[in-house]
């Protein structure tokens, strides 16, 4: 046994040497990347909020390998251990090893793809798709293989599993073979197109991500893309995308952007096909590089892009819904605050509730810097809306921050001033431990009536500051679900090549609590929210922890009494709503899908699984449609091609109305419902 291990070890030593000679990185590039790596290390050790962090160079290399081979399908455990044959004394040593390891990964991947192509070409009928074996949907938490022969054997099983999924959609062996062979060819092309900058970026970010998930290096190209997203200066759909195991996922919708306004996409949806226009053929983008998918989606203003979209819980090989979105530039006015009024009827009387929807904390910074008196901002727009609602004699206000991922920090405490007047809003701590409080010494409330802040898992950053200050001051109720949990501030600096974005501040509520990782806990939860564990700071590796510091002085308004009674009343109301059963059924289905990690390599078993899965989804959807008096779907294909906005909008409206109902409950349960007055000073 020792001889076998020793042989593997020597083989890898030989391969590393051979890789180094076959895939040389120029001395010029090695020197440049080493310099950039040194600069990044210096900046983070001196300025990052978590600058006392300590880890070994070997930890970075292991993280790098796990990043490029997270499914453990390329490197054996012995090969990973053997990197220690090269002592890492300098950044140049690390950069050199990063390229050697990547090119080992690349060459082995290309070799395995060739074996997979041979496996597919041997398939002639369903008889070749019968087996008692299985593969795993996700190998990230499993042990690595002990030998290359095990890897090769498993990769052949994987491609058969993928072929079965495609075949069950196509019902034609030759069509399925053509489709999967094209996909394998795309994988080879993607591997061959990876640049030196991207390889270096993968390695340096294996280092930066030890600090926290918001600290990362950007190549000149990725920096340009980041600025495009920030300024919305190129036409697209207004969505931030990421790639996970070859599948493009939506991680954020830009407020006011074409995708958000269409209502056809949501966070965690998967994009598996793109047609650059309505006249172009749909391109399967599974296993495409994220930058190439983005290039397909972008295009001239007012043109249409077609997307094939799958929900997060679906199988990656499902036939998705084809949607059309018109490309456009995200304009400030499209993301602006909007108002409306709704009426909540009670036996005693009708209550008029004002609604303000605030999708982001925006500000026309360019106009502000030019001292234009009419510059546009969220606080100015909300102030105007409050004046209009006050003239309508509303009984209370719901400020809807669902989906609001933040924006300008200045706007958070400008908005807080409208509701609390003078006072501290947030504490900001620097990496050196110095603390600064932000708020207003002067000013008065623009609205002193009852208020509810409505939040969800996508309410982040500035949204959490505002929700936190309303809660700490006992100014109103926070309702909905636990928020995202981003309580840090980042800074961007230029390096010799590319840029470094790093976390330099952490903010705290006036009560001393951090929103980092924990978010803001609502006073009253509304159950009509899908609990997706993939959303939130808590889902990120190495996210900074929650902690608390000393509180600072802040005023306390009259606290809303009878919170427990409000919870009970709301629970009684929502438990009888079919929406609760619908969400619970979706959640249960999603959890079962996630927990079942095995896929049989037998076409008949997989066909049965597919039928069962589609029937379950159809039952869940049609039960809810029956409750809504909507026509049920005839089959799964009709469901997939249906308009997701129909149910999504209804769910959002039900949650909003429940928030308004709770506000009216509080008005009825408390003796002084019309205005909440200033209370005593508390620390």
Question: What would you call each of these model-derived segments?
Answer:
Residues 66-67, 87, 98, 102-114, ...:
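PDZ/PDZ-like domain segments forming the peptide/carboxylate-binding groove
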Residues 4-13:
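Sec-dependent N-terminal signal peptides
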């Amino acid at each position: 046994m020792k001889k076998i291990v020793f042989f593997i070890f020597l083989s890898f030593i030989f391969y590393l040497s051979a890789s180094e000679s076959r895939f040389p990185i120029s001395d010029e590039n090695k020197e440049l990347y080493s310099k950039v790596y040194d600069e990044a290390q210096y900046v983070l050790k001196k300025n990052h909020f978590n600058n006392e962090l300590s880890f070994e160079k070997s930890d970075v290399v292991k993280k790098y390998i796990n990043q490029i081979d997270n499914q453990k399908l390329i490197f054996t455990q012995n090969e990973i251990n053997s990197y220690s044959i090269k002592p890492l004394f300098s950044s140049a040593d690390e950069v050199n090893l990063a390229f050697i390891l990547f090119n080992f990964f690349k060459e082995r991947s290309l070799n395995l793809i060739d074996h997979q192509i041979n496996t597919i070409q041997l398939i002639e009928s369903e008889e070749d798709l019968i087996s008692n074996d299985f593969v795993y949907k996700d190998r990230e938490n499993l042990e690595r293989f002990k030998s290359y022969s095990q890897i090769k054997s498993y990769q052949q099983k994987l491609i058969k599993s993928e072929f079965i999924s495609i075949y069950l959609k196509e019902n034609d062996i030759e069509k399925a073979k053509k489709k999967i062979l094209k996909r394998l060819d795309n994988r080879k092309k993607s591997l061959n197109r990876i640049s030196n900058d991207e390889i270096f970026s993968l390695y340096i970010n294996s280092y930066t991500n030890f600090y926290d998930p918001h600290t990362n290096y950007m190549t000149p190209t990725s920096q340009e893309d980041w600025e495009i997203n920030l300024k919305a200066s190129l036409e697209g759909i207004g969505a931030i995308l990421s790639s996970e195991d070859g599948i493009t996922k939506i991680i954020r919708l830009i407020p006011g952007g074409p995708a958000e306004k269409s209502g056809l996409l949501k966070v965690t949806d998967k994009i598996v096909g793109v047609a650059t226009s309505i006249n172009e053929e749909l391109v399967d983008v599974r296993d495409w590089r994220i930058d190439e998918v983005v290039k397909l989606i972008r295009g001239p203003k007012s043109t249409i892009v077609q997307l094939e979209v799958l929900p997060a819980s679906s199988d990656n090989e499902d036939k998705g819904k084809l949607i059309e979105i018109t490309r456009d530039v995200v304009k400030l006015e499209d993301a602006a605050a909007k108002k409306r009024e709704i009426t909540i009827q009670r036996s005693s009387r009708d209550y008029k509730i004002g609604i303000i929807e605030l999708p982001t904390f925006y500000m026309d910074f360019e106009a502000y810097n030019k001292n234009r008196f009419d510059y546009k901002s969220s606080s100015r727009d909300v102030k105007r809306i409050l004046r209009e609602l006050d003239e309508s004699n509303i009984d209370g206000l719901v400020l809807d921050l669902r989906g609001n991922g933040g924006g300008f920090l200045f706007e958070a405490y400008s908005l807080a001033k409208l509701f609390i007047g003078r006072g501290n809003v947030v504490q900001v701590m620097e990496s050196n431990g110095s603390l600064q409080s932000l708020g207003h010494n002067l000013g008065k409330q623009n609205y002193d009536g009852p208020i509810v802040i409505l939040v969800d898992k996508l309410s982040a950053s500035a949204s959490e500051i505002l929700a936190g200050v309303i809660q700490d001051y006992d100014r109103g109720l926070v309702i909905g679900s636990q928020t995202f949990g981003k309580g840090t501030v980042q800074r961007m600096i230029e390096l010799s090549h590319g840029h470094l974005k790093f976390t330099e501040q952490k903010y705290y509520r006036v009560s001393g609590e951090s929103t980092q990782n924990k978010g803001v806990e609502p006073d009253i939860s509304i159950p009509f929210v899908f609990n997706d564990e993939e959303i939130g700071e808590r889902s990120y590796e190495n996210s900074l922890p929650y902690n608390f510091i000393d509180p600072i002085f802040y005023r306390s308004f009259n606290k809303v009494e009878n919170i427990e009674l409000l919870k009970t009343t709301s629970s009684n109301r929502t438990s009888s709503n079919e929406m609760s059963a619908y969400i619970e059924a979706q959640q249960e289905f999603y959890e079962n899908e996630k927990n079942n990690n095995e896929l049989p390599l037998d076409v008949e078993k997989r066909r049965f699984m597919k039928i069962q899965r589609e029937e379950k989804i159809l039952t869940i959807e049609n039960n809810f449609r029956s409750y809504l008096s909507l026509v049920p779907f005839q089959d799964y294909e009709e469901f997939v091609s249906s308009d997701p906005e129909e149910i999504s909008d209804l769910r959002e409206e039900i949650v909003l109305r429940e928030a308004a109902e709770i506000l009216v409950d509080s008005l009825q349960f408390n003796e002084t419902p019309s205005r909440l007055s200033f209370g005593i000073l508390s620390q």
